[in-house]
UniProtKB/Swiss-Prot annotation:
This is Large ribosomal subunit protein uL15B/uL15D. Residues 21-40 are annotated as: Disordered. Transmembrane segments: none annotated. It holds the Pfam family Ribosomal_L27A. Gene3D superfamilies: 3.100.10.10. The gene is rpl27a-2.
Length: 149
């Protein structure tokens, strides 16, 4: 925005010309930036940035995430993931009709194992891994096994 007068003309008569009465447009004697955080600006740092100084733990470079982490669930526990109301809703479902989908990965299980028995009710099971027995038992009741990433 263009103005008629320069700032110096407008500020005539004001002692400090907008630069404050103490510093009077002189250098930074307190230091620049975050200088003095543990000395003359300690109260400001402890109030607004209490965790700025000091150690904050360490990263553990030699430990890797467990690449073999694979929580599993057995076939006889599959229906417990969706609840009894869903099982009752699809009680009389036939093969080819709409059947419930049980997503094991969403519930925290990656692998489905074959222990136990499934109710004679078709179901679609999604998991990362299936044992052979689990696949056989799910397909025996008219269900399907879907692999997910």
């Amino acid at each position: 925005m263009a103005t008629r007068f320069r700032q110096t003309r407008r500020r005539r008569g004001h002692v400090s010309m907008g630069y404050g009465r103490i510093g009077k447009h002189r250098k930074q004697r307190g230091g620049r930036g975050n200088a003095g955080g543990q000395h003359h600006r300690k109260t400001w740092f402890t109030t607004f940035h209490p965790d700025y100084f000091g150690k904050h733990g360490m990263r553990v470079f030699h430990l890797k995430a467990n690449k073999y982490y694979c929580p599993s669930i057995n076939v006889d526990s599959l229906w417990s993931l969706v609840g009894k109301d869903v099982q009752a809703q699809y009680k009389n479902a036939k093969v080819g009709e709409e059947v419930p989908v049980i997503d094991c990965v969403k519930h925290g299980y990656f692998k489905v194992l074959g222990k136990g028995f499934l109710p004679k009710q078709p179901v679609i099971v999604r998991a990362r891994y299936f044992s052979e027995k689990a696949q056989q038992k799910i397909k025996a009741v008219g269900g399907a096994c879907e692999l997910t990433a």
